[in-house]
Regions:
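Terminal, low-structured helical/coil segments at or just beyond the last alpha-helical repeat
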Residues: 3, 12, 16-23, 28, ...
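Canonical positions in the second alpha-helix
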Residues: 24, 57, 90-91, 124-125, ...
Length: 297
């Protein structure tokens, strides 16, 4: 995920930002040049080089809390999450109300799977900067992972109010609405996501799953078929089709879809099908038992 701050500073042209430093020092101070280079390099996905520039800035000015946050984001982009948290903590020690550092710390903790702590820090981020749509989005995502769907719906609504083109926010809001069994609202929200990103296979999958919960099995199968057109290597879509066919007591189609599922992902879905109530109507059939109990496809 590319952060709002870095999207803003990526106006620097990379080729200009990494020009010979001594020639540029006449117009800007060395710290400004290095910071600009680091921001541009981050925006270009050159995170290690960005880290080097930010490190040089911090040698010159170890109290620059903004650069400590930039340093933290660069570390997070390199999956060095514990080190990134150290950088965000240094930023916050200097400026405790700096929203971007709270945001970064929460994001890093979420990446490490610490969703409770992540939600705590992301809440601080949106308190200090309520217009940070990415922070609202990341807060909602953490709340989804915690099963706090009512809270996450509110967070995604804030995120969408700031950026109405963020299909990820619509998608995750749809997931949360399913979590509280508001399936009609979920379907409308997923339609908005698909309007913005019609080839997002995972949104079609979620739409299909929602339609199954609504008992609209034919439409669900059509959604999974659309998903497969967008992404062929897509076991979740085949599994969704198997569920919908099973609810219609269509043994042959169920077995065909499960076969395709197990070819693509033989272990996880074989465990899931053993516990999935959608298949209970076919579970005692000998052919079904042979399919789910076969050790290998």
């Amino acid at each position: 995920m590319r952060w709002a701050y870095f999207e803003q500073v990526s106006r620097y042209n990379v080729s200009m930002a990494v020009q010979n430093l001594p020639e540029a020092e006449g117009a800007l101070g060395r710290k400004d040049i290095l910071r600009g280079q680091g921001s541009a390099l981050y925006a270009a996905g050159r995170y290690k080089e960005a880290l080097s520039r930010f490190h040089e800035v911090l040698i010159l000015n170890p109290d620059d809390y903004e650069v400590w946050a930039l340093h933290g984001f660069s570390l997070a982009a390199e999956n060095q999450f514990e080190a990134s948290i150290d950088s965000f903590n240094k930023s916050l020690a200097i400026s405790p109300r700096y929203a971007l550092a709270w945001h970064g710390k929460g994001h890093a903790l979420a990446k490490m799977g610490y969703f409770e702590e992540a939600a705590t820090y992301l809440k601080r981020a949106v308190i200090f900067d309520p217009k940070d749509g990415k922070a609202w989005y990341n807060l909602g995502t953490a709340q989804n992972r915690l099963g706090r769907y009512h809270e996450s719906i509110a967070s995604f609504e804030y995120s969408i109010s700031i950026n109405k083109q963020d299909y990820h926010a619509y998608f995750n809001k749809g997931v949360a609405l399913c979590g509280v069994q508001r399936y009609e609202d979920a379907l409308k929200t997923l339609h908005q996501a698909l309007h913005l990103k019609p080839n997002a296979y995972y949104i079609w999958n979620q739409r299909g799953t929602t339609l199954i919960q609504m008992g609209r099995f034919k439409e669900a199968i059509e959604s999974f078929d659309r998903s497969l057109k967008c992404q062929a290597h897509n076991p979740n879509a085949w599994y969704g089709k198997a569920r919908a066919h099973a609810m219609q007591k269509d043994l042959v189609s169920t077995l065909q879809a499960l076969y395709r599922t197990f070819v693509l992902s033989p272990y996880m879905y074989r465990v899931m099908v053993q516990l999935d109530a959608h298949f209970d109507g076919l579970r005692q059939d000998p052919e079904f038992q042979r399919m789910i109990n076969t050790s290998a496809i």
